Amino acid sequence: RLDCRFEILKTFTEEWTDARHRLADLQPRGYTRIGPALRHATELLSRTDARRRLVLVLTDGKPNDYDRYEGRHGIADVRRAVLDAEARGVHIHAFAIDHDARFHLPQMFGRGRFHLLRHPRSLPRALGEAVAAMHPG
């Protein structure tokens, strides 16, 4: 695919205030090619010396693209990217608001690595839970 978009919402050096504004301004952009984005994020985070590396994915939970990146192929690609990230010390956690995502999220991200949200308003709480789980105690 010639056009795979990747957006960084917060860098390591900026304050959360700026990132919150970008998060609030997010809009759907069509197509959800999750696997390549996860591989890119994994590569970027693998270059850091951070003790913990976490990728938070906000998705409709349906990997798809115009070139048949969907169904079993898309799900398997995302699963492979998640497993590869974990092997490199990068943790992936997904958030989806679409009710139908319940069918795909467990297959792609694995048990305990996703939140299925009923409404966008519940995202801040779910984000906090996911980050807190990475920092027990």
Language-model features: where?
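Acidic, glycine-rich A-domain
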Residues: 1-137
